[in-house]
Amino acid sequence: MPTLKLIGLGLSAKFVTREAIDEISKCNVVLFESYTSLSCDINLDFIKFLNKNVIIVDRKFIENNIKEIIKLLKEKEDVCIVTIGDPMIATTHVSLIVEVKDKGYNFKVIPGISVHCYIISKSMLSSYKFGKSVTITYPYNNKIDTTPYDVIYDNFIRGLHTILYLDLKEDKIMTAKEAVELLIEMEKIKKQGLVSDDRIIIVGQRLGCDDEEVVALRLKEVFNYKFKEPPHIIVFPTDKLHFMEVEALKCLMK
């Protein structure tokens, strides 16, 4: 029976599993998502090396063309949706699987290493102390979305760390410096004392690549620090730290 396969490639080519390679190679139609994340060496050419029948798709295609995907399955073709990282981080994929299963078709999930799990490991903070994650987005119509501040604050007062994803647009990628600038502006609006000069954050840069870097910095140090090229990701730790977490942060400080 035709099968919908959700395949994660991990953060870079060295993390691509044998199972992922095998499934992509034998798939009838490969849809490569270009909007979920960036990789230093996974691109269209990489996917085409495994399978020539590749179509680059964006978020709108997956959300708005479920019927087209069902049609491909009806034509007795396996369909592979390939993503950088892990495929099931996106809720769109969950709804797609539910729809496909409801139509009587099979599905298969091939996990990949996600930036979520990766930065938790690299931060060396206690994995069970991470709360809800949130994305810092660019202002829209000159208005800043302060939702990230609210999420960080709620986690912070409960002794939980926050992972901050940074906005990814077709024409630009948010940097750690831009994200901190927005957090400072949010502080001016919210005035809860959360974002201050001496607050420590962890910044992951080009995770999974050979030149990756993970560093702990005080906010006042961010603007003079020479970061690597994006993608970046930020961890905003709580101040309710176990003594071993304190020592771990010291290991990441320059």
Curated annotation (Swiss-Prot):
It catalyses: 2-[(3S)-amino-3-carboxypropyl]-L-histidyl-[translation elongation factor 2] + 3 S-adenosyl-L-methionine = diphthine-[translation elongation factor 2] + 3 S-adenosyl-L-homocysteine + 3 H(+). The keyword Transferase applies. Keywords: Methyltransferase, S-adenosyl-L-methionine, Transferase. One of its GO terms (molecular function) is diphthine synthase activity. Pfam families: TP_methylase (PF00590). S-adenosyl-L-methionine binds at residues 11, 86, 89, 114-115, 166, 207, 232. GO terms for biological process: methylation; protein histidyl modification to diphthamide. Its EC number is 2.1.1.98. Pathway: Protein modification; peptidyl-diphthamide biosynthesis. InterPro entries: 4pyrrol_Mease (IPR000878), 4pyrrol_Methylase_sf (IPR035996), 4pyrrole_Mease_sub1 (IPR014777), 4pyrrole_Mease_sub2 (IPR014776), Dphthn_synthase (IPR004551). Transmembrane segments: none annotated. Signal peptide: none annotated. Belongs to the diphthine synthase family. PANTHER family: DIPHTHINE METHYL ESTER SYNTHASE (PTHR10882:SF0), DIPHTHINE SYNTHASE (PTHR10882). S-adenosyl-L-methionine-dependent methyltransferase that catalyzes the trimethylation of the amino group of the modified target histidine residue in translation elongation factor 2 (EF-2), to form an intermediate called diphthine. The three successive methylation reactions represent the second step of diphthamide biosynthesis. Homodimer. This is Diphthine synthase. It comes from Sulfurisphaera tokodaii (strain DSM 16993 / JCM 10545 / NBRC 100140 / 7) (Sulfolobus tokodaii). The lineage of its organism: Archaea, Thermoproteota, Thermoprotei, Sulfolobales, Sulfolobaceae. The gene is dphB.
